[in-house]
């Protein structure tokens, strides 16, 4: 099955109010659009909250698999969040034909007139739990590795709904998004963590997390 863009979402920072009366500023609830222009730092009309942790060259856009989205819905088992609606996890794109098991770090995809490069998995934060109003959401995403992935922009252009994703390059065919997620949850040994640090295209933010894991190994050893 060819990989395709099923839905595109962009959004601005807004004040969100939750059932417990709490509020915070976030751009997590992105809205569906039919197409979007892509620039060097992301998508036109799109913003992120908590810029210390989101956005930038290595986190320009966030992709999720439709299969993973549906699996998370089943695991959360409280509310159903259709992937064709307003973003639940802050996703910019939901795709078919790709998931954490067949997307690799450094993959380059042509979509419409753009070229994007996979830079790292998404590290789930507490705001996922807050937005779904389910305190287990973050842990479930972390434990299952159904994280989605970030990309950096290689060539700007326009992406439309139903565009196909054409794989142009795969420099690290053994290093899937699932594999990288496992390094942060259940690494086998220090050597495989050291090996990941040698991957040039892996985002520095993710490498910092790997270094933290290495420190834990050294403390245990």
Swiss-Prot record:
Molecular function GO labels: molybdenum ion binding; oxidoreductase activity; pyridoxal phosphate binding
One GO cellular component, as annotated: cytosol
Example GO biological process: toxin catabolic process
Coiled-coil regions listed: none
Positions of the MOSC domain: 30-168
Annotated TM spans: none
Disulfides per UniProt: none
Domain of life: Bacteria
Listed InterPro entries: Benzoxazolinone_Detox_Enz, MoCF_Sase_C, Pyrv_Knase-like_insert_dom_sf
Protein name: Uncharacterized protein HI_0278
Record organism: Haemophilus influenzae (strain ATCC 51907 / DSM 11121 / KW20 / Rd)
